[in-house]
């Protein structure tokens, strides 16, 4: 499904051209893969998830540097609650379990996340962390990096809490699309117990 050729979409320098390629080439893939993930998440959690695909409606000049789909339990949106994201940048696919700055009660989640530090360090040794979904900066899982993300999320207005994986386009998995898709799905589903814990607060 996802292939290295998909990154060529971001070679188009125009807003109209890039958006058209996103809408006609990537979004159909998001629809298919998103439906698969919806089913897997429903089985794993006994909850109903809605698929949201970025539409870039506020873009009037600069072409988007990335595009994504999100899965949340609300049909009205996803940024104000814990959710999953799978998306493309110009050089990567990203898979995140995300708690974003828009969450109205995000500081309520910080103590619970902090209490899970030991388990996070043991269960997600090969995962990445970030505190800002708008940048490419990511941090490998480590005690210091986890503390950094926790502090940014708890103590700064724009701080976010992102756990997941980044697949750079030179990753050998892109030579085997079926293995890539399976790995992305496994990466996301491994975070389901954390999602359920967070949502049980």
Curated annotation (Swiss-Prot):
Pfam families: DUF1054 (PF06335)
HAMAP family: UPF0637
SUPFAM superfamilies (alphabetical): YktB/PF0168-like
Identification of the protein by name: UPF0637 protein LCA_0842
Domain of life: Bacteria
InterPro entries: UPF0637, UPF0637_domain_sf
Family: Belongs to the UPF0637 family.
């Amino acid at each position: 499904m996802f292939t290295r050729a998909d990154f060529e979409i971001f070679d188009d320098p125009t807003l109209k051209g890039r958006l058209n390629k996103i809408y006609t080439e990537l979004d159909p893939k998001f629809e298919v893969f998103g439906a698969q993930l919806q089913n897997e998440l429903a089985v794993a959690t006994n909850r109903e998830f809605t698929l949201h695909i970025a539409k870039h409606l506020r873009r009037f000049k600069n072409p988007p540097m990335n595009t994504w789909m999100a899965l949340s339990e609300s049909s009205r949106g996803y940024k104000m609650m814990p959710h999953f994201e799978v998306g493309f940048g110009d050089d990567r696919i990203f898979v995140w379990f995300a708690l974003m700055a828009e969450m109205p009660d995000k500081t309520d989640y910080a103590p619970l996340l902090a209490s899970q530090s030991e388990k996070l360090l043991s269960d997600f040794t090969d995962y990445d962390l970030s505190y800002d979904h708008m940048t490419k900066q990511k941090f490998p899982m480590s005690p210091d990096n986890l503390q950094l993300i926790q502090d940014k999320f708890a103590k700064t207005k724009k701080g976010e809490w992102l756990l997941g994986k980044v697949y750079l386009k030179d990753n050998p998995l892109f030579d085997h699309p079926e293995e890539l898709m399976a790995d992305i799905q496994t990466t996301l589903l491994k975070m389901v117990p954390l999602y359920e814990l967070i949502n049980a607060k």
